[in-house]
Amino acid sequence: MNLWLLVCLVASLMGAWSTVHTQGVSEDCCLAYHHRARPRLLMRAQGYQRQEVSGSCNLPAVIFFFPKNKMLCVNPRVNWLPNVFKFLDNRNNTHSKQHLGSRRNLQDSHLGGQRSNTGMSRLAHSKSKSSRSTRSNKKKTSFLNMANPGP
């Protein structure tokens, strides 16, 4: 009888473990809006993504991505939000049109708009700046491609 009880206990713990383990894989989504967001702040974002209601995300939102993996959730019904979308789309399209088909558009966006017009290679340009260390070398580029993925 004790063996049967032990088997039932182990089986129930294994079932509970898989449930607890899969909860950690849930979606990253906005659960509340940031009500103090203003257009000037949002125009400094690296990109944005629209969040639709699905799964555990029960709130429609727009997620703005900033340096150092910071995010800000905004209500999509705010009346000035289309102006911010237009500004970010124009800024990101300008970078991608200048370096179409190359990986330099991600690197150049971290230079703060400084570009080499002399035709120097990226390596030569970085060697000329190696005497000073900038924070832009440490930024992550994972969110730069996320500008306007939605309709």
UniProtKB/Swiss-Prot annotation:
Annotated localization: Secreted
Region (Disordered) location: 94-151
Pfam family, one: IL8
Cellular component aspect of the GO annotation: extracellular space
Keywords: Chemotaxis, Cytokine, Disulfide bond, Inflammatory response, Secreted, Signal
Family annotation (SMART domains): SCY
Principal location: secreted
Stretch forming the signal peptide: 1-22
Biased composition (Basic residues): 124-141
Superkingdom of source: Eukaryota
Database matches in SUPFAM superfamilies: Interleukin 8-like chemokines
GO molecular function per UniProt: CCR chemokine receptor binding; chemokine activity; chemokine receptor binding
GO biological process, one term: positive regulation of cell migration
Function noted in UniProt: Potentially involved in T-cell development. Recombinant protein shows chemotactic activity on thymocytes, macrophages, THP-1 cells, and dendritics cells but is inactive on peripheral blood lymphocytes and neutrophils. Binds to CCR9. Binds to atypical chemokine receptor ACKR4 and mediates the recruitment of beta-arrestin (ARRB1/2) to ACKR4.
Membership in a protein family: Belongs to the intercrine beta (chemokine CC) family.
Protein name, per record: C-C motif chemokine 25
Gene symbol of the encoding locus: CCL25
